[in-house]
């Protein structure tokens, strides 16, 4: 009898809590507007579609109800999507926030590396890792970008004068080789061995991640891990990915021990840090001290894995969507070619691009920025509020999920008139100075902004200069049909089909 009363009391409590929570949500939903949710399943039916359609539906609903829109998922899972500058600022600058639930799907692979960590751990890691992007180190990385872009250009030569082909896959492999070599000092040789296991596993993780976002069990991690067939597959792939990184770390540690380098621990003020020959990101982690202690292998692995994930799909999309726009806008491509000739001279095809020379490519930078406006590599970023937060005069409860839609922010017609039009002039110095700090944020803003943005810009510039100095890129027949899809990174659904003509 007593037990029955306890059960009945608990059930009643849960029902009351559910109704209360639902009423709060209804109030917020009414305030912001959004698609009408069905009982229990929310708006899940709207998203029960093929992959690019999921993205298109999200954008359609945001346009219809935005700039700030409320979505409801299974049961009481919900999120607010914001793109108005004042709400974006409040969310990105919130002192108390974690990455949203979506990111935890990557945790088995990336653990709590820089992207996923929060609080003190994040703060300490960001401090340690920041020197890896010092310009002295970036200068060395530029040599790697040159080498890998040269391989890409050579591999592309077989398409000159041929039928349309997908250039996205070539860019992906080039970016993967570049991040592997700069972060670990090792080569997976993806460009010449695309069937390499590591390359295949990284790709599979992206697909599994995307499928999980829209899985009905997405919000129930324990159940998902127990019963979902894809959970088993994910665990297997993660084991293999870790095995690879573990072996690279062990090998490098051994090399450093043998050369007597490992004992020479670095501190932030160590001048040698910036003058080291061929310093990789992994070397920095292997040599750094935190409170007098070196990082252990697991701590190093999570950071290296994070870089492998964040550091190649993002630049791949940046480069590929710039190619897409330049193929469609030959005048812009011509201006970049003129810039190449003006800076590097007529014999520019095999020029060795240095950090300093890359700073001179102003129009190219504008062209890349405009492509990142239309196709921001990370189109949404998510936060889990850790304290009640007021937006537009209404209080969002702590625990709420908020998505910042970079994709929609960049299409605000008041800031970017005729927003779908590709026009690099939007990034002239004069035009840029007239915009607010939250009008254009491809690398996010605030303390959690992208640590790799200068690295990314250098890699993108090198790849595009090498490509355009060698070939004129023309649109393939099916280029007009391009559709995009997104997991954490935006991608062309069927690649970027182009044709190539050799330059004189
Ligand atoms: C075009 C290229 C890139 C774009 C558009 C981009 C964009 C972003 C964005 C929007 C974030 C914020 C994510 C969030 O708040 O959830 C971010 C974070 C991050 N990015 Fe990038 N990224 C790019 C390239 C790179 C590269 C090349 C690296 C590494 C070499 C990198 C490493 C990271 C890391 C580690 C974080 C987490 C930083 C932190 O929370 O402290 N990114 N990136």
Label the model's feature ranges.
Residues 175, 179, 183, 237-245, ...:
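Central I-helix of cytochrome P450 enzymes
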Residues 330-332, 440, 453-490:
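Cytochrome P450 heme-binding "Cys pocket" and the immediately downstream C-terminal segment
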Residues 404-432:
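Conserved cytochrome P450 K-helix/beta-meander segment immediately N-terminal to the heme-binding cysteine loop
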